[in-house]
Amino acid sequence: MALEENYHSRDYLYGRLLAVAERIEEDALNITGEKRSTNAARLMQRFADQPAKTWLTLYKALDSYMQRLQVSPTGFLHSRKKELGEILEMFDREDYNNNAPLSGEFLLGYYCQRQKRYAKFTTTDTTPTGEAE
């Protein structure tokens, strides 16, 4: 199944946010040569149970990773921030603030968003490590 970029389901959108956050963390860790799990991966179960509260925690933690990626000349960070913004704009305010557990649909959004990373694009967007998107 391909990523549905205009699908507005709360669970699907939260899954997409988690995938983008994980991507930012992964690439920041790769730049510094760190070999550990991302916060997004470690907090996935908590995220499924309390998405609004856990997203706030993850988003605050992203700042230090984004600082590491500032030195990247590829536009990777700008693209990820834009992606986060586009996903956040699709939320209904009440859905975004709803801390009820997510259904399995969040995993669909998560994996479809992650798969987008490996799809072939004709753009020149690359990761900080030079990997083509």
List each language-model region with its residue ranges.
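Intrinsic-disorder/low-complexity detector
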Residues: 1-133
